[in-house]
């Protein structure tokens, strides 16, 4: 069941759903608008010959902090990681789905590549996977609305929510745009093959 604005407010007011910083004006009829933070991760295209998900390529990205009052310029064909200004803490019975804002999509900005699902129990800033598919550069301003988070009531609370020790939740508590930790999905047995 998709939460309505009134159910989103109830969940926040009860302390069930955590959003920090919270602005009540961000609540939409069936979602919460999310804003862009000032941190971006850019890819170091000359450091590696290719991306290998099996390897920990620490120097694949560099963190860039945009100065107050300045935008980040995303050029055509570029892909960067960014993050929401807001930190979200989802209870064990709510899951989220991040979508872009239609006004930005109409300009050629894609907000996420594939990772729009937010598990119950997640706590942290949501990493955004931004792509410019337009023919012109797009300026990205810290604090601008960049997406919307829809929340779904689950049929029952998750038995093993995100962040549980047994899951190996790699992105729990993340702050800022967090690079891939996909290499942790490969076991040491696979590494010896």
Swiss-Prot record:
Keyword field: Hydrolase, Nucleotide metabolism, Nucleotide-binding
Chain positions recorded as dCTP binding sites: 101-106, 119, 127-129, 148, 162, 174
Nucleotide-binding as UniProt keyword: yes
Top-level EC class: hydrolase
UniProt catalytic activity: dCTP + 2 H2O = dUMP + NH4(+) + diphosphate
InterPro entries associated with the record: dCTP_deaminase (IPR011962), dUTPase-like_sf (IPR036157), dUTPase_trimeric (IPR033704)
Site (Important for bifunctional activity): 116-117
EC number from the UniProt entry: 3.5.4.30
Biased amino acid composition, Polar residues: 167-177
GO MF annotations, alphabetized: dCTP deaminase (dUMP-forming) activity; dCTP deaminase activity; nucleotide binding
Function of the protein: Bifunctional enzyme that catalyzes both the deamination of dCTP to dUTP and the hydrolysis of dUTP to dUMP without releasing the toxic dUTP intermediate.
Assembly with partners or alone: Homotrimer.
Family under the similarity heading: Belongs to the dCTP deaminase family.
Protein name as catalogued: dCTP deaminase, dUMP-forming
Lineage: Bacteria, Bacillati, Actinomycetota, Actinomycetes, Mycobacteriales
């Amino acid at each position: 069941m998709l939460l309505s604005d009134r159910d989103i407010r109830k969940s926040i007011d009860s302390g069930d759903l955590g959003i920090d910083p919270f602005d009540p004006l961000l609540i939409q009829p069936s979602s919460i608008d999310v804003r862009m933070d000032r941190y971006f991760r850019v890819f170091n295209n000359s450091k590696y010959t290719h991306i290998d998900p099996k390897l920990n390529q620490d120097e694949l990205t560099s963190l860039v902090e945009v100065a107050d009052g300045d935008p980040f310029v995303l050029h055509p064909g570029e892909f960067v990681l960014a993050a929401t200004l807001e930190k979200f803490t989802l209870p064990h019975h709510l899951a989220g789905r991040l979508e872009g804002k239609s006004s930005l999509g109409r300009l050629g900005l894609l907000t996420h590549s594939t990772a729009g699902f937010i598990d119950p129990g997640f706590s942290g800033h949501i990493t955004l996977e931004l792509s410019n598919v337009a023919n012109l550069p797009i300026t990205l301003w810290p604090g601008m609305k960049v997406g919307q988070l829809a929340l779904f009531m689950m049929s029952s609370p998750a038995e093993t929510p995100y962040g549980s020790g047994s899951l190996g939740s790699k992105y729990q508590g993340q702050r800022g745009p967090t690079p891939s930790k996909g290499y942790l999905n490969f076991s040491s047995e696979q590494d010896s093959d």
